[in-house]
Each structure stands twice: as C-alpha cells, then as structure tokens.
Amino acid sequence: RIMVSHVWQAITRKKRFEGDSHLDSNLRRCLGLMDITFLALGQMMGAGIYVLTGTVVRNQAGPSIIFSFALAGIAALLSAFSYAEFGARFPRAGSAYTYTYIGFGELWAFIVGWTIPLEYMIGNAAVARSWSAYFDNMLDNYIKNTTIGALGELSEPGGFFSTYPDILSFLLICLCACVIAVGPKVSANVNSSFVVLNIVVIFIVIVSGICYADFNNWTGTTSDGRSMFFPFGLTGTLTGAATCFFSYIGFEVLATAGEEVKSPHRTIPVATFLSIGVIMTLYILVSSTLTLMVPYDQVHTTAPFAEAFSARGCTTVMYIISIGALIGLTNNLVTGVFALPRAVYAMADDGLIFKWLAHVTSSTKVPLNAIVIFTLLNAIIALIFDIEALVEFLSIGTLFAYSFVSGSVLVLRYQSAPIDGDGKRMDNGGELSSWIPARNFWESLPAGTSISLGVAALIGSFFWLAFTFRTGFYEHWYGQISIGFNGLLIVLVMAFILGHQQNSLETSFKVPFVPFLPCLSLLVNVFMMAYLTTATWIRLFVWMGVGLLIYFSYGIRHSKEAKKLTTIADIRMSSTFPNKNNRITKT
C-alpha cells in the first residue's frame, strides 16, 4: 500500500519553478523575432504548398480549398493560443512535454514527450524522402534505378520497408544535422535565407498564375450539375480542412526553441501569430491561383503548379517552381532536425531519460549527444522504412500533444499564483464558488486536481460525441438520447470549471475567453483524432508501452523534480508555483 502511494505521488508530481528559474538555461539565447518567425515558417512552408494543395483540390474540396485552408488555419490558431501563453510564461525547450509536466504531472508529460521525438523523426524522414523523390524525378529516376541495380530491392511495394534504400535522404538528414550542430544562430540564418527564397518563388507563382486566371473555373456548374466552386459540397470542404490542418503543424517549433530566444515573454507570442497569419495568407493566395488557372478536375495531384505552368508552355516558371519545391522541403527538414534534439534534451535535462543526452557543448551551446544519436536514428528511418506506412502516426502524435497543451492552460489558469516577488503570498486562484457541491472535498485535493478531472471528463465526452458521429450511432433514437446526456454532462463540467476562480498572474500574453477557447480547441483536436484509423491508435499504444518501460525502469528514479520534493506533504501539495497555501485574505 505504501509502495502504491509512493508511485502515485511520483507519477503525479509537477514541474515547479522558483522565481525566475524558468529563464535559466544551458543553451544560448541568441534568436530574435525574425529568426524564430522564419523558423516556424520554414517548418510550415513546403509540402503543404507544393504537394498537398493538388490532392485536396482534385479529390476533396475543389476551388473551395481556400475555405478549407482558412478553417484549418483557425483550428490551428486555437491550439496556437495555448502554445503562445505557455511560451510567454515558461520559455523552455520541450514544448508540449514541458507544458504537460506543468499542468498534468510527470507521467502524462513523459507520454507526451515520448511521442514528440517520434513525431519529428517521422516528419523529417517523410520530408527527406519527398525531397529525394522530387530531385530524382528531375533526373528521370536515375538515382533510384542505379541504387536498385547496385543493391537490389529491400521489399515489395506497399510493405513496411521501402522498396529500395534511399541513400540520398539519409545523407540529406546527416547534412542538416551538421548545420544544426554548428549552433542555433547559424542554422537560423540558413533557414531564414531559404524562407526568403521560397517566398520569392511563391510570389512569382502567384503573379504569373494570375495572368492565366479564368473565373469560369469558379462559377457555373459541372456537367453533372454540381457547383464548380463546391464540387464536393460542404462535406468536401470540411474534409479538405481536416487534411489542410496538418499544413499548419510547425508553429510549435517556436516553443521547442524557447530556451534560445531573446526576450521570450514577448517574442514567442508575436512570432506564433505572425507566422500563422503569413502562412494562412500564402496558402489561400496560392490555392486561389491554382484553381483559377486550371479546372479542379484537371489539377495534377503530385506536382500541381509545375504541371499547370507546363500546360501553359511556361517552362521557365515550371523550373522555378521545381527549385522552390526543393527549397521549401529543405526548410521543413532544417527546422525539423533543429527541433528534434531539443525535444530530447528537455526530457534528459529533467532526468526522465538518459542524462548524457542533455550534454551541451561549451563552444556552440547545442545538445550535441542528442543531435548525433537521434538524427542518426532519423536518417536510418528515412533510409529503409516506407514513410507512407508511418506518416499517419504523425497526425495522432501532434493532436495528442495539442490536446494536452490546451488542457494544461485550464489547469494552470485555475491554480493560485504568487502576488509578490518572492512567492510567499498567493492569490485566490483555484478557489471554488459557494454553489459548487462538495466544495470542501474538491478544495482538499492537491492543486489543479479538480480541474484535471474536469478536463478528463470533457475529453471523454468529446470522444463519445465523435464516436456517435463517426459510426452513424446518432441516427438511432438511443444514439440521440446518448448525445443529449453527453451534452448535459459537457454543460455541467463547463459550469464546474467556471465555478473556479482564475488566478491574477500577469503575463505578456494570456489565452482569451478561458475556459471556452481551450475547450473548443480540445473539441477540434479530439474529433480529428477520433477519425484516425484503428491501426494508428494501436501503433500509438505500442510506442507508449515502450516509453513506459523506460520511464518506470529509469525516469521515475532519476527525475530532477523528485529531488525537490523531499516529503509527502511537499509532493501532495506540489503545484507549478510554490507556497500555494499562503493565500491573501480578501478584504
């Protein structure tokens, strides 16, 4: 019984900061506003423009893709609000992992943190193989044919392994790692140069494409009576929005670089919204250009812009687009390789995975061990695995992290916070209104527990709601009754959360309309997760199982937070801010 109690206290302990200790870092703070804005743009700008646009236009949304990109951008913005608040309040490497550690405790933080390196490795491998395929296609598949001729095939098409070892993608990831290892400022300058070149290419595409615009591609009806603008109906536009959402994945790299940003309290929120605003504008402009140039049913799915200009005889612009695609994919890869070791460093620095991975070089101030080990592993994944078999896993890992960050905002907002410099006096954050049933019981729980339970209830309700729509359960009378009960539960939980008092902590940015906006973000993320395949969920649980073995055999005993909490009372009452019981008395 004592052992169970000890384990429970260990897995629920939260990351705490004393005074300004959240600003302490072994890394070098050298990145400014434009550096990290371009870092986020580099992560978001690439495959979303040059590859994804054609697929969504042709198969899902038609010209209404402009609304798909707008809706997806708004959905991404909901999560970005939460990241911006945490980035301003706690500018630490680790991103969602660190924020979950603060809000929900060590075990959930480890689970989220364990998915982040895999997310980056799969994403980087997919981008590297796309870069390799795009470049090889310009050479008429010379590299592929030569490799197969020399080494043979690894497996049959459609298997878990690639049909041939992609040596070019392996070398490309290793090259990016060398750039990253030189230092954050050098890699930021390289990335910024590529972003500027890519934006120039995109403007060339837009200006040149408008010259061939035909508004008949947007108006009128198709031969079978469908709207030219909404050929797949509203459902198609919404389906396209779900696909386009993943074009915005990348703004969280700002939070990953939090320990290397100058003036992070102001810079991170501004860069977050600036990058999303710029990329949303570019997505809408380029998709408008494409659908005005070519009827939606004639858009090429693999190389939409290059083929559109090729059909018009504009070979010069076609080659510029091909170069722009390589630049955009290089952006994706540089920023992805930049973020990967920093996500690992954050967990290692907290003692949850092997401490030697947190080693920072004295000269360049980068986590060199994490760079070497994980980029090498990343390069091997790109070399031999079929990325299409793994890429859907990228979606669930990202949405999983986004959900916990939104929930962590709620937990943190309803905790008491210091009202003086030394943290000896606390405000009334987290106090319950008198009308809340069993008020004394809820207030006797450790800080944030009641809100955490409320968030868990909301997530469960949202998943059930998504299940009823995905399976068609809502079409039956008993399904409609369950929706009614579920809706009532959501209302009651929201009322319970609203019955808590928010803290008065002042920061450079706070999520507006709490708790409604974070809860809306949770709803969107949960619905998208619920529509992923069963196989994807199985892979997630298998990966989590491997991570939990590492945590319970190593991390739980070497956690840095365990050394701060020396008594059961400390552990029980732990919160993000110390001295939570020294609240001021209202007058």
State where each predicted segment sits.
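Alpha-helical transmembrane bundle of multi-pass secondary transport proteins
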Residues: 1-587
